[in-house]
Amino acid sequence: MYPAHLLVLLAVCVSLLGASNIPLPSLDFEQFGKMIQCTIPCEESCLAYMDYGCYCGPGGSGTPLDELDRCRQTHDNCYAEAGKLPACKAMLSEPYNDTYSYGCIERQLTCNDDNDECKAFICNCDRAAVICFSGAPYNDSNYDIGTIEHCK
């Protein structure tokens, strides 16, 4: 995958963050993108994850359309749980600047032991999401569906 394409995908999801009014713990989007690249060997096809289903980024709504969309919903819910941790409260004011420590060896992700409680929780949210993405089929009919009419 081309890093610029992944950043475009993540930028779309970030734009949804601003509209959602949901406070979230830290997420380094470039780092999350690198996790995705580690696990999912998607070149240009990664662009197709933009505007997919009802849950691209926090603030999704409605019933997930398929397994991939459920992965995204679960990721949103995991971040909501992280936001309830006392250790994560301090990071809510700067949600995109903090990074966690992780490893990638032969397409296997691990969250490193040197993360504090909040970073470990967030790393595991992202790790679980990426693993879920890698096992979920992509359904072309769920791309660019128009969330207003399909995600109630």
From Swiss-Prot:
Recorded catalytic activity of this chain's protein: a 1,2-diacyl-sn-glycero-3-phosphocholine + H2O = a 1-acyl-sn-glycero-3-phosphocholine + a fatty acid + H(+)
Keywords of this entry: Calcium, Disulfide bond, Hemostasis impairing toxin, Hydrolase, Lipid degradation, Lipid metabolism, Metal-binding, Platelet aggregation inhibiting toxin, Secreted, Signal, Toxin
UniProt tissue specificity: Expressed by the venom gland.
Class of the enzyme per the UniProt entry, highest EC level: hydrolase
Cofactors (names): Ca(2+)
Signal peptide segment: 1-19
PANTHER family: PHOSPHOLIPASE A2, PHOSPHOLIPASE A2 FAMILY MEMBER
Similarity-based family: Belongs to the phospholipase A2 family. Group I subfamily. D49 sub-subfamily.
Name assigned to this protein: Acidic phospholipase A2 S16-19
Organism: Austrelaps superbus (Lowland copperhead snake)
